[in-house]
């Protein structure tokens, strides 16, 4: 499949940006799976990885790369992750895999955030697809009502519990013109753990896998 080839190419291209880092952050998703595959080729140079999900942690363990606790680190040089959508300002929507809270924490801790995507993830305005929001279970209905007031159409993601023990609401009909403002508004709703808008901490470098090769935006 062409899309998988693009994901693999951009996953391997990200190796260039972690060669000098002994400890790195790693996200979650199908594109990141290819990056983890690529890490296997330089694992002897890596002291440890801060992982954003149990799924990625298991992948890293299988290839023998040790995991690190973010609390034990003074600094984190680089974080590599993918996105569900990304605009020309390097603002993103993330969270399809349910790991948005840990992804946001690691991104905030890292000096540099490398986003790896295939060209299908590029959008003019964020909100083409659903916006994931992690919520405390007891607040799910309250948060949903507040999201309706903001113009959204929230749907409960059934049979999904995050690594933090919470629920996910997927919000449709959100054309996100001012991503930073909406990120703040949703984060301020009681019961919201994290919203999948990455505007305040956007990517520093974006690698886009295209049919013509790797496109780099800085």
Swiss-Prot record:
Pathway: Carbohydrate degradation; pentose phosphate pathway; D-ribose 5-phosphate from D-ribulose 5-phosphate (non-oxidative stage): step 1/1. InterPro entries: NagB/RpiA_transferase-like (IPR037171), Ribose5P_isomerase_typA_subgr (IPR020672), Ribose5P_isomerase_type_A (IPR004788). One of its GO terms (biological process) is pentose-phosphate shunt, non-oxidative branch. Substrate binds at residues 28-31, 81-84, 94-97, 121. It comes from the Bacteria. GO terms for molecular function: ribose-5-phosphate isomerase activity. Its EC number is 5.3.1.6. It catalyses: aldehydo-D-ribose 5-phosphate = D-ribulose 5-phosphate. Pfam families: Rib_5-P_isom_A (PF06026). The active site is at 103 (proton acceptor). GO terms for cellular component: cytosol. Keywords: Isomerase. It is an enzyme of class 5 (isomerase). Belongs to the ribose 5-phosphate isomerase family. Homodimer. NCBIfam families: PRK00702.1, rpiA. Catalyzes the reversible conversion of ribose-5-phosphate to ribulose 5-phosphate. PANTHER family: RIBOSE-5-PHOSPHATE ISOMERASE. This is Ribose-5-phosphate isomerase A. It comes from Blochmanniella pennsylvanica (strain BPEN). The lineage of its organism: Bacteria, Pseudomonadati, Pseudomonadota, Gammaproteobacteria, Enterobacterales.
């Amino acid at each position: 499949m062409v899309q998988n080839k693009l994901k693999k190419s951009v996953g391997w291209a990200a190796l260039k940006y972690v060669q000098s880092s002994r400890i790195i952050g790693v996200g979650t998703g199908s594109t990141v799976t290819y990056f983890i595959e690529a890490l296997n080729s330089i694992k002897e140079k890596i002291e440890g990885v801060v992982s954003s999900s149990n799924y990625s942690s298991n992948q890293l363990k299988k290839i023998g790369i040790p995991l690190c606790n973010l609390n034990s680190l003074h600094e984190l040089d680089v974080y590599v992750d993918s996105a569900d959508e990304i605009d020309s300002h390097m603002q993103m929507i993330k969270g399809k895999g349910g790991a948005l809270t840990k992804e946001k924490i690691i991104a905030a801790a890292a000096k540099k955030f490398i986003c790896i995507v295939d060209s299908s993830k590029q959008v003019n305005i964020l909100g083409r697809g659903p916006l994931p929001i992690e919520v405390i279970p007891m607040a799910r209905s309250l948060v949903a009502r507040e999201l309706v007031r903001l113009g959204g159409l929230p749907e409960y993601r059934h049979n999904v519990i995050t690594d933090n023990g919470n629920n996910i609401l997927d919000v449709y009909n959100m054309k996100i013109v001012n991503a930073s403002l909406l990120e703040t508004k949703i984060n301020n709703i009681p019961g919201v753990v994290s919203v999948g808008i990455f505007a305040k901490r956007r990517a520093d470098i974006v690698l886009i896998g295209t049919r013509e090769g790797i496109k780099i935006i800085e």
